[in-house]
């Protein structure tokens, strides 16, 4: 597995993810083109400014993109936390890519002392995401509603102390 910095070459991957009903069912449905463009620009700006980390997940060197991994700060209740997100397209799911990408991003965050803890908010309806959080050593916290690009998501809050 390889993580590459997100670039304009990955815009098609964002469109693939955000327009796939299987991937977006829990997130308010597929995004219209203008919203996809806004997300693409946000991911690129986060990468270029280093405010957040956005990586393209590839199964191997030179392979087509299989998904995205993010680590960025977000407001949460009365605080700012660091959130980890991994999205792998259906054709590449169940191959361990999300787990491997998450481990790599967490290891880098730990090495660079980017944060003291990492949070994840997988949809309650995703037992695979919950199993991944548990396998990575995250502690299960509370159920909550989170905002995902303007859509309300019923999620489970997980946290990993680095």
Q: How would you name each of these model-derived features?
A:
Residues 1-12, 16-22, 54-162:
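Acyl-donor (CoA/ACP) binding surface of acyl/acetyltransferases
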Residues 27, 37, 42-45, 68, ...:
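Conserved, charge-rich beta-strand/loop surface module that forms ligand/interface-binding patches
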Residues 43-56:
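A short helix-loop-beta-strand connector motif used in the catalytic cores of GNAT acetyltransferases and
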């Amino acid at each position: 597995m390889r993580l590459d910095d997100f670039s304009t070459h990955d815009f098609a991957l964002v469109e693939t993810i955000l327009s796939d009903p299987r991937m977006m069912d829990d997130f308010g449905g597929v995004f219209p083109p203008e919203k996809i463009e806004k997300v693409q620009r946000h991911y690129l700006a986060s990468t270029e400014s280093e405010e957040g980390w956005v990586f393209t997940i590839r199964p191997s060197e030179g392979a087509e993109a299989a998904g995205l991994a993010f680590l960025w700060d977000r407001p949460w209740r009365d605080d700012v936390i660091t959130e980890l997100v991994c999205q792998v397209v259906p054709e590449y799911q169940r191959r361990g890519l999300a787990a491997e990408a998450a481990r790599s991003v967490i290891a880098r965050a730990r090495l660079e002392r980017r944060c003291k803890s990492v949070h994840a908010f997988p949809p309650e309806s995703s037992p695979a995401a919950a199993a991944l959080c548990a396998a990575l050593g995250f502690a299960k916290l509370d159920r909550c509603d989170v905002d995902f690009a303007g859509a309300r998501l019923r999620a489970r809050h997980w946290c990993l102390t680095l």
